[in-house]
Amino acid sequence: MSRRHAAEKRQVLPDAKFGDMVLTKFMNNLMIDGKKAVAERIVYNAFDRVEGKLKRAPVEVFHEALENIKPAVEVRSRRVGGATYQVPVDVRPERREALAIRWLINASRARNENTMEERLAGELVDAVNMRGSAVKKREDTHKMADANRAFSHYRW
């Protein structure tokens, strides 16, 4: 692996229906086996359900849900003299977004509704209302960082 140049960040194209780049990233993460059309259908149908439940623009709901899931701090392992410490560090904006998307998808997949559309819609509604597994994951991450605040001077 060459150390000369950092890999170039590729721009994702905005999605067809709403023209939103974050939504495209979300669909790409949701996609399994390269089936983008299936991922798009799941997201758009989930958005229709969300719009029916909350009577609000689904893209706004999506972004609000992501904001409620994004972590501000996380812990990273750091070895110091034979001991491993969990050191709290701030999360970069790109990683915040990536973690929020990943947690939202995993929380949706873990739910008990029948279809992925229902699960995703339910998790989005829960995230907007500060409930649900994805928000709990963020809260747990923040608690972990808070509990290990004593080791913050090991930050690098």
Swiss-Prot record:
The keyword RNA-binding applies. GO terms for biological process: translation. One of its GO terms (molecular function) is structural constituent of ribosome. Disulfide bonds: none annotated. It holds the Pfam family Ribosomal_S7. One of its GO terms (cellular component) is small ribosomal subunit. InterPro entries: Ribosomal_uS7 (IPR000235), Ribosomal_uS7_bac/org-type (IPR005717), Ribosomal_uS7_CS (IPR020606), Ribosomal_uS7_dom (IPR023798), Ribosomal_uS7_dom_sf (IPR036823). Keywords: Ribonucleoprotein, Ribosomal protein, RNA-binding, rRNA-binding, tRNA-binding. Belongs to the universal ribosomal protein uS7 family. One of the primary rRNA binding proteins, it binds directly to 16S rRNA where it nucleates assembly of the head domain of the 30S subunit. Is located at the subunit interface close to the decoding center, probably blocks exit of the E-site tRNA. Part of the 30S ribosomal subunit. Contacts proteins S9 and S11. This is Small ribosomal subunit protein uS7. It comes from Jannaschia sp. (strain CCS1).
